[in-house]
Design a protein with these regions (language model features):
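Glycine-rich, often acidic, oxyanion-interacting loops/wings at catalytic, nucleic-acid
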Residues: 8-114
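A charged, well-structured terminal subsegment
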Residues: 1-6
Length: 173
C-alpha cells in the first residue's frame, strides 16, 4: 500500500456517512422549500416531515382562508414526492450503517463495538468516527489532535509569544 492511501474497505465505509450527510442536507433543503412556498401564502405551521403531510396539504388554507392555488399545490406535491424518496433512501443508508455496526458483524473491530455500546454515543457518531479516523494509526496524541483540528496555533512577533487558540484545519468530519 502507498503511504496515505486508504484501502478499499475503509474508503468504501466512508461513503455511508458521507452519503447520509448529503441526504440529510437535501432533506433540509426540500423541507425549507416547502415551508417557504407555504409561508408566502400565510401558512407557517405546516411540518412536511410529519407522517400526515399529504392529508394536511389537502386541508391547508391560505392565510386569508382560500384554498391553496392549484399549481402551487401541485408543485408542493412534487416536492413531497422528492422528500419521500429522500426519506426512503435515508432509511436504506441508515439500515446499511446499522448492519455494519452490529456486534455480530466480523468487519467492525472491537473498539468500534465498544464505542457503539457507550451511552450517549449513537450509531451515526460511531460510524463517522470509525469511517473517518479509527482505522488510521497515529503515533502520538499530537497527530490525533492535528487530525481532529485541535492543534494549538502559536503566534510570535519579536519577543512576544501568544497562543491564538485552536486550529480549525483538521478533518471537518
Amino acid at each position: 500500500d502507498l503511504p496515505g492511501f486508504l484501502g478499499k474497505g475503509p474508503q468504501d465505509r466512508r461513503r455511508l456517512c458521507r452519503e447520509r450527510r448529503t441526504l440529510v442536507a437535501e432533506r433540509v433543503a426540500h423541507v425549507n422549500r416547502i415551508k417557504g412556498l407555504l409561508f408566502a401564502q400565510g401558512i407557517a405551521d405546516h411540518e412536511p416531515l410529519h407522517g400526515n403531510r399529504r392529508q394536511r396539504l389537502e386541508a391547508l388554507r391560505t392565510g386569508d382562508g382560500r384554498p391553496l392555488p392549484l399549481y402551487l399545490k401541485a408543485q408542493i406535491g412534487r416536492e413531497l414526492d422528492r422528500l419521500e424518496l429522500l426519506l426512503e433512501q435515508l432509511k436504506t443508508v441508515e439500515a446499511e450503517r446499522n448492519a455494519l455496526l452490529e456486534p455480530t458483524n466480523d468487519v467492525a473491530p472491537v473498539a468500534v463495538k465498544a464505542l457503539a455500546g457507550l451511552r450517549g454515543i449513537g450509531p451515526e457518531f460511531t460510524a463517522m468516527l470509525w469511517s473517518e479516523c479509527l482505522f488510521r494509526s497515529f503515533r502520538n496524541r499530537r497527530q490525533i489532535a492535528a487530525y481532529a483540528g485541535l492543534a494549538p496555533t502559536p503566534w510570535q512577533s519579536g519577543s512576544v509569544r501568544h497562543e491564538q487558540g485552536v486550529s480549525k484545519s483538521g478533518n471537518p468530519r
